[in-house]
Curated annotation (Swiss-Prot):
Primary localization class, coarse: secreted
Function per UniProt: Secreted effector that completely suppresses the host cell death induced by cell death-inducing proteins.
Keywords: Host nucleus, Secreted, Signal, Virulence
Compositionally biased residues, Polar residues: 305-323
Cellular location(s): Secreted; Host nucleus
Signal peptide coordinates: 1-17
Family: Belongs to the RxLR effector family.
Gene name in the database record: RXLR70
Domain of life: Eukaryota
Descriptive protein name: Secreted RxLR effector protein 70
Length: 451
């Protein structure tokens, strides 16, 4: 029992020392108090003895001293380890902070598998796959760099779009927003004729360009002044804008594919910029070639009727402007003298007609008239002319051929009553294109009202 009592006493001493440590006293004070307590216990030990053993109490006291000395040694060793324990306690706040950060670290660990999957999906594709696509794009672009000689337009500087222009945008200009993307549609004014025009236009372009009905209508609007008057600068911007729309459509296709989206987003900016600009130039060159073909063949696509008498020169395979140039150069003493129309006098009125048949005598400047004069179908002249017919003076008619066709009004002129001659003007007064002050367009000279 006494042994248990001593153990309890020692534990109480240790507990009291820990309380003093918690209240801020230094470790030397703990040692001093413990030594005092030990001395007090050692001082009382000789007076203690067991009941009915009064004669042998000295031996018991010695035994108790030996036992307590061992216990005191254990306590001293424990006190020696107290500073280290205190250091551990001082480090506990830092450990607590580390524990607080553990949840975020756990979140990072949870995202590692997804990141690993992304890394596995992105390895060599940007450098290999997109580089191959870029090489193919540049090769195709070089093939489509310029229009074919057969479809290269002539004349008409007002609608000239360079076919050898290369467009390069900076990476900041390619912030492609796929919201609000609307495909093009056939214009309302073209719906009645679009099928015929689109079919023939597709044959002219071939499978290499393969235009759609909507694209045909879009190009048609650039030459149709009834819809929007335009110039070469406006048309160029429209073609560039439409090429960017095609690139946006390509990007939408990439975004819809999870596989390609990861590959595209993982590629470097320099590579993506090259791909985007190459796609832009490919689409732009395609639009320019379709634009050139439509400009050259526009009279035949839109206004060439089946009756050959309404086509200038009777040649359906070439543009009207080219045909007019050939006839005037080969059959007239003046290089650009139009021979496809004459002014005729019948009574008190003038009739502007298109000749379906011509006969030429020895004098190249004389044109024979048909036996039967055709009736005037419209108050609009097929060509604006300025001529002198005997003493009948016809004032110059200024007309501008817009891109939808010839649009001019013929103002009747009342001749002097004193003159009744019906003869044609002499060769010196032959009609010339310069006198008419006519602005030629590549579409040729035609009047939709005569069709």
């Amino acid at each position: 029992m006494r042994g248990a009592y001593y153990i309890i006493t020692a534990l109480l001493v240790v507990a009291s020392s820990q309380e003093l440590r918690g209240s801020g006293h230094q470790l030397q004070i703990y040692d001093h108090d413990v030594v005092k307590a030990v001395k007090a216990v050692m001082k009382t030990l000789p007076n203690r003895f067991l009941r009915e053993s009064r004669d042998v109490h000295d031996d018991l006291a010695n035994e108790e001293r030996s036992f307590y000395s061992i216990l005191a040694d254990i306590i001293n060793k424990g006190m020696d380890t107290m500073p280290r324990a205190a250091e551990g306690v001082e480090l506990m706040p830092n450990a607590a902070e580390g524990v607080e950060k553990m949840p975020r670290a756990a979140e990072g660990v949870e995202t590692i598998p997804h990141a690993a999957e992304g890394v596995e999906n992105m390895p060599h594709v940007p450098d290999e796959g997109l580089s191959k696509a870029l090489t193919g794009a540049k090769t195709a672009l070089n093939k489509l760099w310029g229009p074919f000689s057969a479809t290269t337009p002539i004349g008409d500087a007002s609608h000239d779009v360079s076919s050898r222009e290369q467009i390069d945008f900076e990476i900041g200009s390619w912030s492609i927003d796929l919201r609000g993307f609307k495909p093009i549609a056939v214009h309302d004014q073209h719906k009645d004729m679009i099928q015929r025009v689109y079919t023939k236009f597709g044959q002219l372009c071939g499978n290499n360009l393969n235009p759609t009905a909507e694209e045909t209508s879009l190009i048609w609007t650039m030459f149709d002044s009834r819809i929007v008057p335009s110039s070469s600068k406006d048309d160029r911007l429209k073609l560039i804008w439409q090429a960017r729309q095609n690139v946006r459509s390509d990007m939408r296709s990439i975004s819809s594919s999870k596989k390609w989206r990861y590959r595209w987003q993982g590629s470097p900016d320099s590579l993506t910029l090259d791909v985007l600009n190459s796609l832009l130039n490919m689409h732009y060159q395609r639009w320019v070639r379709m634009y050139d073909i439509f400009k050259q063949e526009r009279p035949d696509l839109i206004d060439a009727p089946s009756n050959s008498k309404h086509t200038l020169g009777g040649n359906k395979d070439s543009s009207s402007a080219t045909t007019l140039h050939k006839h005037s150069k080969g059959l007239s003493s003046r290089p650009f003298e139009p021979l496809n129309a004459v002014m005729m006098s019948h009574g008190d009125r003038f009739v502007s007609t298109q000749r379906s048949k011509r006969t030429f005598g020895s004098n190249a400047d004389t044109v024979s008239l048909p036996l039967k004069q055709p009736k005037m179908r419209s108050s609009k002249a097929l060509m604006p002319l300025s001529a002198t017919l005997g003493d009948y003076s016809v004032p110059p008619l200024k007309s501008r051929l817009n891109f939808g066709g010839a649009s001019s009004a013929f103002v009747p002129y009342t001749h002097p009553k004193a003159h009744t001659s019906k003869s044609l003007a002499p060769a010196s007064t032959t009609l010339t294109l310069k006198d008419s002050e006519l602005e030629l367009s590549l579409g040729g000279i035609y009047d939709k009202n005569t069709g």
